Structures are given as structure tokens and as C-alpha cells.
Regions:
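An acidic-aromatic pocket/loop used at catalytic or ligand-binding sites
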Residues: 1-137
């Protein structure tokens, strides 16, 4: 009985150890985040927008990387979308069927640029990517 229990534990434990070794953000995600953060479109704000913060990070669960900028902006969503409809393609981004969503190959994966808002006077411009090339907007 003890031997069977140990065999069962070892059988379950090996995949769990492999999973834990693969869990979380690492050097590849850090490098991708640095590349995304340098994308010029993050600094291409509409007229009248004031940058509040720049940020980047990685979600350990799915290793999704984000780099973004938050702006104080008094304009409308239509004005913001119109602005990025010109600024994003000028920086190499392609439009999609989703308003405010653009795609571009960055560091060997497909990155998604999302323009959100303004909501409560805040405009978010984010680039999201993962090594699985997931559809992110």
C-alpha cells in the first residue's frame, strides 16, 4: 500500500514539478516588455492629452505582457479613435475589425494595441502580447 501511494505521488508529482518550473514570467517576458515599452505609439497622444503614467508588467498566470500609457484626456472616444487611426498605422500597426485595436509583429510574436476610453477623463493606450500569439482585443 505504501509503495502504491509513493508511485502515485511520484506519478502526479512529476507533472506538477514541470508545471511549476514553467510557471510565471521570466527573462523572455521581461525582454518582450522592454521592447513593447519602446513602441513610439505609446507616446503619440492626441492633442490636449497629458501623460499621467507609463507602465509595463507581466501576468504570471498566463505570461501575458503589457506596456501602456495612461493619459488625462478631455476629448471624446471618437476623437481618440480618430487620432490613433492615423498614429498607429504611421508607427507600423495594422487596424483590425475591432475599433481601437491594432496588431503588429513585435519581437517574434503578435502584439495588440488597444485604445480604451476616455473613461472618467482617462485614456489608456496599451500593448499586450504573449508568446502564444493569443487574440487580445
Amino acid at each position: 500500500m505504501l509503495v502504491a501511494g509513493l508511485v502515485g505521488l511520484v506519478g502526479v508529482g512529476v507533472p506538477a514539478v514541470a508545471f511549476l518550473a514553467e510557471y510565471g514570467c521570466g527573462e523572455r517576458e521581461e525582454r518582450l516588455g522592454a521592447v513593447l515599452a519602446r513602441e513610439s505609439v505609446l507616446g503619440a497622444a492626441p492633442e490636449g492629452a497629458r501623460q499621467r503614467e507609463r507602465y509595463r508588467g507581466c501576468d504570471d498566470d498566463d505570461r501575458r505582457v503589457v506596456a501602456g500609457a495612461a493619459y488625462r484626456y478631455g476629448g471624446s472616444a471618437a476623437q481618440a479613435l480618430r487620432h490613433y487611426g492615423g498614429a498607429a498605422p504611421a508607427a507600423g500597426w495594422r487596424g483590425t475589425d475591432v475599433p481601437g485595436c491594432f496588431v503588429k509583429e513585435v519581437d517574434g510574436t503578435t502584439a495588440h494595441l488597444a485604445v480604451e476610453g476616455p473613461k472618467d477623463g482617462e485614456l489608456l493606450v496599451e500593448i499586450l502580447a504573449d508568446r502564444e500569439a493569443s487574440a487580445l482585443c
